[in-house]
Curated annotation (Swiss-Prot):
NCBIfam families: IscS (TIGR02006), PRK14012.1 (NF010611). Pyridoxal 5'-phosphate binds at residues 75-76, 155, 183, 203-205, 243. Pfam families: Aminotran_5. It comes from Psychromonas ingrahamii (strain DSM 17664 / CCUG 51855 / 37). Homodimer. Forms a heterotetramer with IscU, interacts with other sulfur acceptors. The keyword Iron-sulfur applies. This is Cysteine desulfurase IscS. [2Fe-2S] cluster binds at residue 328. Belongs to the class-V pyridoxal-phosphate-dependent aminotransferase family. NifS/IscS subfamily. InterPro entries: Aminotrans_V_dom, Aminotrans_V_PyrdxlP_BS, Cys_deSase_IscS, Cysteine_dSase, PyrdxlP-dep_Trfase, PyrdxlP-dep_Trfase_major, PyrdxlP-dep_Trfase_small. One of its GO terms (molecular function) is metal ion binding.
Length: 403
């Protein structure tokens, strides 16, 4: 067993060796290194063929059409293209947008930018389990609602939203519906037709592919139009200019192909490991699972260990690569905005750790993690005056601290 143990699959995944091997075939002089837009020689033809195959593999996993796949640099760009592109193109319908407070920053900050441009954004509050209900959406949908953007699976707490329910409402209201599926694709079934989704964002590096490549599903039936955010050679049917990186695209296609084949078996194994981890720690005092345990992807468990500072906990668990907050925002010491949105107080939000398990996690690693967590939580609590006060029955919330 190699230390540290990687339990941060929600922030990124290692590239599957099969994917890396595929990627290498499109880089070197001996491989197919051509520009897919070069139509006058075999180097270009072969590269274009590889891109076409990858498009099919990606579409296959989400029950879409290959012509509905637009390649981008990742889910952040896909989210920007979807939200700004649709809001600008359909501005005549209205300037009202709906999203949720627990979305990824790539969605929230894009919506904030549109607010600066004069759009009105409604932010839905999730329930305590992290779920947003179709009823909540129904109550705020308006005739001038141009776009709804709601994630499929939350990156911090792993809860699964009712995308089909939202899709029905948006379709009936003639509102464009965008879904950030970077945390769900390859982990749970996605059928874009059944879900009535217009736009859907994906990233390769959350599904054992390389970083720097993603895609946006853009529905053809009903046809959705977007205003381009990147201008140049008119690649990707004018929606996203820039030379296509064949090696990254082929690798993303391979990652999606493997996911389609192995998703069911991966889920069973990963869920067993998560259950093992949770059973190993949940008999400890003041341990809280954040977000719904029922409506949740197999690989995510987010736990608050009360009376322990999250930052000191991460330091103490130095042999475990885990995250406190999401990777994109954990550089700041603010408590997680996702946990605050579901009603966790600052203390519990600060003491939260996200464990995310993946394809290469072993039982031995989980057992080691349980051992190290139990040992260190006890040690850190022994050093905490708050823990002593709690054990003495003092209500900490009733104390007024002098500044």
């Amino acid at each position: 067993m190699k230390l540290p143990i990687y339990l941060d699959y929600s922030s990124t995944t290692p590239v599957d060796p099969r994917v890396a091997e595929k990627m290498m075939q499109y880089l070197t002089p001996g491989g197919e290194f051509g520009n897919p837009a070069s139509r006058s020689h075999r180097f270009g033809w072969h590269a274009e063929e590889a891109v076409d195959v990858a498009r099919e593999q990606i579409a296959d996993l989400i029950s879409g059409d290959p012509r509905e796949i637009v390649f981008t640099s990742g889910a952040t760009e896909s989210n920007n293209l979807a939200i700004k592109g649709a809001a600008h193109f359909y501005v005549k319908k209205g300037k009202h947008i709906i999203t949720a407070k627990t979305e990824h920053k790539a969605v929230l900050d894009t919506c904030r930018q549109l607010e600066r441009e004069g759009y009105e954004v409604t932010y839905l509050d999730p329930k305590e389990d992290g779920i947003v209900t179709p009823q909540q959406l129904k109550e705020v949908l308006r005739p001038d609602t141009v776009l709804v953007s709601l994630m499929h699976v939350n990156n911090e707490i792993g809860v699964i939203q009712d995308i089909a329910g939202f899709g029905e409402l948006c379709r009936a209201n003639k509102t464009i519906f965008h879904v950030d599926a970077s945390q769900s694709v390859g982990k749970i079934e996605i059928d874009t037709q059944a879900l009535k989704v217009d736009l859907m964002s994906f990233s390769a590096h959350k599904i054992y592919g390389p970083k720097g490549i993603g895609a946006l599903y853009v529905s053809r039936k009903p046809r959705v139009r977007l205003e381009a955010q990147m201008h140049g050679g008119g690649h990707e049917r004018g929606m996203r200019s820039g030379t296509l990186p064949t090696h990254q695209i082929a690798a993303m296609g391979e990652a999606f192909r493997i996911a389609k084949e192995e998703m069911a078996s991966d889920e069973v194994r990963i869920l067993a490991l998560r259950t093992r981890l949770l059973n190993g720690v949940n008999d400890m005092e003041e341990v809280y699972v954040n977000g719904s345990l029922e409506n949740r992807i197999a690989g995510n468990i987010n736990i608050s260990f009360n009376y322990v500072e999250g930052e000191s906990l991460v330091m103490a668990l130095k042999d475990l690569a885990v995250s406190s907050g999401s990777a994109c925002t954990s550089a700041s010491l603010e408590p997680s905005y996702v946990l605050r949105a579901i009603g966790r107080d600052d203390e519990l939000a600060h003491s939260s750790i996200r464990f995310s398990i993946g394809r290469f996690t072993t039982e031995e690693e989980i057992d080691y993690a349980i051992n190290i967590i139990r040992k260190n939580i006890g040690r850190l609590r022994d050093m905490s005056p708050l823990w002593d006060m709690y054990k003495e029955g003092i209500d900490i919330k009733s104390i007024e601290w002098s500044h």
